[in-house]
Amino acid sequence: MKRKLFWICAVAMGMSAFPSFMTQATPATQPLINAEPAVAAQTEQNPQVGQVMPGVQGADAPVVAQNGPSRDVKLTFAQIAPPPGSMVLRGINPNGSIEFGMRSDEVVTKAMLNLEYTPSPSLLPVQSQLKVYLNDELMGVLPVTKEQLGKKTLAQMPINPLFITDFNRVRLEFVGHYQDVCENPASTTLWLDVGRSSGLDLTYQTLNVKNDLSHFPVPFFDPRDNRTNTLPMVFAGAPDVGLQQASAIVASWFGSRSGWRGQNFPVLYNQLPDRNAIVFATNDKRPDFLRDHPAVKAPVIEMINHPQNPYVKLLVVFGRDDKDLLQAAKGIAQGNILFRGESVVVNEVKPLLPRKPYDAPNWVRTDRPVTFGELKTYEEQLQSSGLEPAAINVSLNLPPDLYLMRSTGIDMDINYRYTMPPVKDSSRMDISLNNQFLQSFNLSSKQEANRLLLRIPVLQGLLDGKTDVSIPALKLGATNQLRFDFEYMNPMPGGSVDNCITFQPVQNHVVIGDDSTIDFSKYYHFIPMPDLRAFANAGFPFSRMADLSQTITVMPKTPNEAQMETLLNTVGFIGAQTGFPAINLTVTDDGSTIQGKDADIMIIGGIPDKLKDDKQIDLLVQATESWVKTPMRQTPFPGIVPDESDRAAETQSTLTSSGAMAAVIGFQSPYNDQRSVIALLADSPRGYEMLNDAVNDSGKRATMFGSVAVIRESGINSLRVGDVYYVGHLPWFERLWYALANHPILLAVLAVLAVLAAISVILLAWVLWRLLRIISRRRLNPDNE
């Protein structure tokens, strides 16, 4: 009886669940992300599998607000694919990919992949094809037809927006065949070239997100957005020194987050921005659009809607005075992990430990060996797979003043694992630094030749090796790329049609251990100055202290928007190099206060009167008039350091022009011989526009070197002119070697003299030793005299 009741209950429950199951199987109405009334999705009949029809979407687009603003974006492979932007897909390396992100306050409503490719004329039609994946979901297949062989082909592939997430990878997989039997996947006839003009057409729609600081820094900076972070800064009017310092802290923090993307901080005085922005306001001095906002009683950070556009957000930094704004800015830079709700009050930001020189988070540590695990920027960076595994790259950002001239090499202890080659052959690991080959190591095919054996069973087995490598130090700069290439001699099928040898190729796996180390702790800090290349590449000398605690910035009394923009862009750029905000930067508008200061000086707008007559200055820009000193001999390349006589100023030329010009100059501080001055000058609004563009553009910064960089409409020209001074410390013997390094004849003479002196010392010691033995013998045996 109990068994019957059990089965009756089971049948009843099954019947009740059946309608629910049927309901879930039908297309469901998509919910609106911004919580507005839902709109039922329009269903379409799915296209036939295998067909690629322009304009046909594989699934319904996400449902979003009808009145939300949208933007159309074209991302070409030249922008988002690995350099040079084009891809050559081959039989043994059939995959290529591009990556793009989607901001958290946007959604993609339409996506189309436009491909321009050329297939090899040797391919078999139809059997050869190009498969397109989005986040490992197959989007479609493009068969290679007879008419396409050897010709440039244009194709469109609709991308299903439902599969687009915060981070996306479009992968192209080439399936190539050139004969029916006995194929060699390494054949040079198996290729398909994808042009760099291929791209993605995306339509983004903005979402009306909630004012919630728990997501900060989103939407003011979104790490999913690969574009330059353009973030306007709004003031009621020309800011005073305290407000300049507060805004510089905020800009440098956003710069530290932007990193390689770049940053730009347009400045507005009492104007509404047209995009997400930062607004600085006090109870007494605020932009007109905040005139009705209640007064505050403490430093407050609040996220509000744009008065005219709810899709645009404003981060308002409020305070009773500039002191409050400074505290709020430090709260953004150091306390943002506690942000939540629409607003927060910054009660206190108390420093606990002072920063030390060269401790910038983005720089490789120079006080101890560093593991490769500390240098990783994403989880799988130190591993690779494939018949020909892709190169493993590690970035090394170093202080520009690291003295490496007499170094015999930098110790690097590498632990690596790799798939064992099936036979002893020429498979190897090549190590390169900045595209310069360093050393090569054979990949052993015998387990006993390696110290460790990985216990996890993998195809063909993984071997473990340990190698010490010495890096030639003179090849290092401020920014370096260390590359590991694993080159395998993969056995390939062969034979004839009647006697064909075939097998399934097996992928190779390579790993550089996280516990591998590199050691820069044994080197001095010493650099000849002025060197604008050190400033352009690493923000040096200001970045020596990551918090800019030993930097003084001299601003005009009443800076205009362009001058404020130069300040914010410069400290933002330095923050991007160091990875740390300028929380202890000093800003002044009185040039007389820098006298006697033990600090590096950044000048924006104009040289203070007391410095204009300094003989170290090699260029000056004042309104329409400018003058410059030119050297005896100019070197065209940044890496070539001229002799002191070649750098000597030969001529000073003064010109007057209505054309725009800007300049960056460097010279020794007259107040401390270990300190430097970097001045960013311009003669007009257009000049400041070119100056800011140069500061924000890494390509233009790369052309800056020497002591003078002149910025004109035609580009940037740099000069090495004037005296050289040295910053840092070397022991006396290293300093002597450095002084003689460029004088080989004198060095040879001194070397000969040193050898003669050594021989003389040895002879003198031998004579003294003989004399002492004679004296000792006579003292002990006076009868033998």
Curated annotation (Swiss-Prot):
Entry's localization field: Cell inner membrane
Source organism (scientific name): Escherichia coli O157:H7
Function of the molecule: Binds the cellulose synthase activator, bis-(3'-5') cyclic diguanylic acid (c-di-GMP).
Cytoplasmic side: 766-785
Upper taxonomic lineage: Bacteria, Pseudomonadati, Pseudomonadota, Gammaproteobacteria, Enterobacterales
GO terms for biological process, alphabetical: cellulose biosynthetic process; UDP-alpha-D-glucose metabolic process
Protein name (database record): Cyclic di-GMP-binding protein
Residue ranges that the UniProt entry lists as topological domain Periplasmic: 26-744
InterPro entries noted in UniProt: Cell_synth_B, Cell_synthase_bac
Pathway membership, UniProt: Glycan metabolism; bacterial cellulose biosynthesis
